[in-house]
Amino acid sequence: MAGMDQVAFDGGSVGFRVSPDEFLRAPQFAAARDEVIEGKLSLYEGSHLFNRLILEEGRLLCHLAALSLHAAQDMAKPATWLTLGRLQREVTELGVASRNRVEAQVSCLRRYGFLTQQPHASDRRVRLLVPNEALLARDAGVLGVLLNGLALFGLSPPAGQPGAPDATLHRALRRATLPRLPALSRLIRRHLPLAPFFAHDCGYMILLLLLRGARQNGDGGIATGYQWLAMQTGVSRTHVRRLLEAARSAGLLTMETRGGHDIRLAPAMWQAADRWFADQLAFMDLLLREALTT
């Protein structure tokens, strides 16, 4: 698998105001990274259904596209409405999912009540997709975690309030996300070393649990094992084992005993994770600055 530095990516094409490398070099970085890990786990732990519906690259981008289109739509302009067709066009242009896969994810989100499909008031032939309050609140919570991380660098909304953004800032952040979705897709894809986690159901959750476990043990061994990780994430023990074996093959961790009771994260894992979180912070900083100026 290609190393991080081998992945061709022009960070300047994203238009970062503060580069990921600047975040990495900052003395506050480790504390901000750990704050983001803890914050995301506080949102994800125990939410097995939601995590399986969202925490995988293609599903994540489809989910973000829906939220961004919802925030950016203008009811006076039909071309901006969040419909299934509009969402399919947006996501397929990113190259992360087919039209059928987008429709399948929308069906799942509707089945569990995270999305509803409602006729437009003036043209009942048009069916609008509408995120429910739980989906919007979860998204605001995720943004709040990253905003809290930025606050450690002195980069936060003018009000400086911790936690999730209010409804106005939330909409502005997701409106700013919409034109940046192609850049976000490229940003995710440049993290090839973390592909074993990003490409599997709940892999991102498992990554966060491993990082937290290693920090709690002074970067020593993690004795949780496959079964505990499976119970925490709502996937099978076999799924966890295969994911961790793929991560071991990629040089991200070591395991010596049966059952995954002696997982140790390799330096390559920390390097890859740090670059991932630096990218997240830089992207969030960009969205925040754009949201506050529109």
Task: Report each predicted region and the residues it spans.
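A short, conserved structural fragment
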Residues: R110-H120, R248-R258
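Compact recognition or signaling/catalytic modules
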Residues: A247-L253, T257, I263-W270, D274-W276
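Glycine/small-residue-rich hydrophobic helix-like segments
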Residues: N217-L252, E256
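Intrinsic disorder/low-complexity detector
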Residues: M1-A76, T80-S98, R111, A121, ...
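Minor-groove-contacting beta-hairpin "wing" of winged helix-turn-helix DNA-binding domains
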Residues: S122-P131, G259-P267
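Short amphipathic alpha-helical interaction segments
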Residues: V96-R111, G234-R248
